[in-house]
Amino acid sequence: MSQKERPTFHRQEVNKTIWEVPVRYQNLSPVGSGAYGTVCSAYDEKTGLKVAVKKLSRPFQSIIHAKRTYRELRLLKHMKHENVIGLLDVFTPATSLEEFNDVYLVTHLMGADLNNIVKCQKLTDDHVQFLIYQILRGLKYIHSADIIHRDLKPSNLAVNEDCELKILDFGLARHTDDEMTGYVATRWYRAPEIMLNWMHYNMTVDIWSVGCIMAELLTGRTLFPGTDHINQLQQIMRLTGTPPASLISRMPSHEARTYINSLPQMPKRNFSEVFIGANPQAVDLLEKMLVLDTDKRITAAEALAHPYFAQYHDPDDEPEAEPFDQSFESRELDIEEWKRQTYEEVISFEPPVFDGDEMES
């Protein structure tokens, strides 16, 4: 949103708050809200697309908020891939840094998420291939920029009528202990090493989540619906078996080592007996994803080349990302400086070239 071509704004009340948006965005209608903002669907007169407009709530109320706002904007600006949600527009009604207080982000409006899809029907193997292929294609891109999603689950995967998929909300997930407690989907898809702080985790935490999602698509039910952290780990180990000594010895946490050593030894189950009737190639891939040892877990790039995706895999059309500068993560700045840098990012945004063939949901 460069200064020289500032659009005309109009105001609209949404859920008792005033939204001030460029006139190109019409018919604002609330579709959801969370801790970090409210989302409206809107019609973009400029492109003819239905879009999602997110107004961040109190983006600069604290250093944590301000840094999170900066992080979300930087991540969204960086992502340019068919299977990852990207930024169509970002704007503020403010005309100067001094009055800069509100940030609005515009992305594609996606019709449904994977949760809706799973509930409605048991998917064919071909559907599962196509959906998981797209998740892995998006993950290969995200991971190549050294970004970890950390919170992949069906509700973070948007799908349209044509089964085209985009990954949402990556790189932001920093859940509180409270949100991870009890019988909650936030935790069911989490890799054990991140759930229990076993060790420094890597990109493959996301692959664990893909394994959980894929198993659910194949069977129509949640793979590890734990009632709490301990029950969840028990459910996981009933399938994977208890970790081998070689893995336990590499866990830096003394507490984790002691706890796992206290558990009764369990053997790994035969996956083809657990996933009866599934495509043997699907079962083979699940075995390579749902591995406790992160060093042995398959990567997104490796998984794309697995025979299960033979009809979709194209090594020349599985792009990687430009490097993403994350040096800001270690910076300790005050609110005003995070705000100034966020304002710079808003001003410097260049919208994607619209080709008229965009994904409609």
UniProtKB/Swiss-Prot annotation:
Tissue distribution of the protein: Exclusively expressed in the ovary.
Superkingdom classification of source: Eukaryota
Residues covered by the Protein kinase domain: 25-309
Binding site for ATP: 31-39, 54
Keyword flag ATP-binding: yes
Annotated catalytic residues: 151
EC numbers for this chain: 2.7.11.24
Record protein name field: Mitogen-activated protein kinase 14A
Species of origin: Cyprinus carpio (Common carp)
Gene: mapk14a
